[in-house]
Design a protein with these regions (language model features):
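A short glycine/serine-rich beta->alpha loop
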Residues: 2, 6-17
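Long, charged, mostly alpha-helical binding arms that flank functional sites
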Residues: 36-191
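Metal-dependent nuclease catalytic cores in nucleic-acid-processing enzymes
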Residues: 19-35
């Protein structure tokens, strides 16, 4: 039962250094034994280099353990860093990139927290909301709609770097720096009318 549910696999991440040995021979073996290919897609990963510019290696002593990153900045900052790599390209580990991911996630969290403090338990229909859109609301919804298209296309092509940079640009600049700052006055007006 497990075999039928998991074979063939949807995707196989693969380092470019072992394509010939693992990906090629796995494909040949599976075709010979089952008549089926072992996976639908292969995503080629680059190698991770240390801050010294050399491939991470225990013998070189330039390995940064994921636990060390997670302990200082959290798993999501590490995921954000990893998502910024371009398939097939090598990536250099740099603490400043981890810190940037951490700052972005903090910005995202703070925006979410700010918005959730403004949402009340009242039931409001979509028609009521739609009837109160102003040009700025339509602008941010247009930006969000465009972001959805870009992210869907990037995901379909395993282009996670475009995905994360597009989301970051939207959240940080369009949503937080422009939209939230521009509509804050609405909150203060509603407090005055109470």
């Amino acid at each position: 039962e497990g075999y039928e549910n998991n074979f063939p696999a949807n995707i196989r991440p693969q380092g470019h250094d072992i394509i010939r040995t693992w990906a090629f021979y796995t494909t040949l073996r599976c075709l010979a034994l089952t008549g089926k290919k072992p996976f639908d897609d292969i995503v080629i990963n680059g190698m991770v280099f240390g801050e010294d510019g050399y491939k991470m290696s225990k013998s070189r002593g330039n390995v940064i353990a994921p636990d060390e990153v997670i302990e200082q900045y959290g798993a999501d900052a590490l995921r954000t860093w990893a998502a910024n790599s371009v398939p097939g390209s090598d990536v250099i580990f740099d603490w400043k990139d981890i810190k940037h991911g951490y700052r972005f996630l903090r910005k995202f969290w703070n925006a979410f927290r700010f918005i959730s403090m403004q949402i009340f338990d009242e039931e409001v229909s979509y028609d009521e909301i739609k009837g109160n859109f102003d040009p700025l609301d339509l602008w941010i919804l247009s930006k969000l709609n465009n972001l959805n298209k870009v992210v869907d296309n990037a995901f379909a092509n395993y282009d996670f770097a475009t995905t994360i940079t597009s989301i970051e640009k939207f959240i940080w600049h369009d949503f937080c720096d422009e939209y939230i700052e521009a509509v804050k006055y609405r909150l203060y007006l509603s407090l005055i009318h109470i």
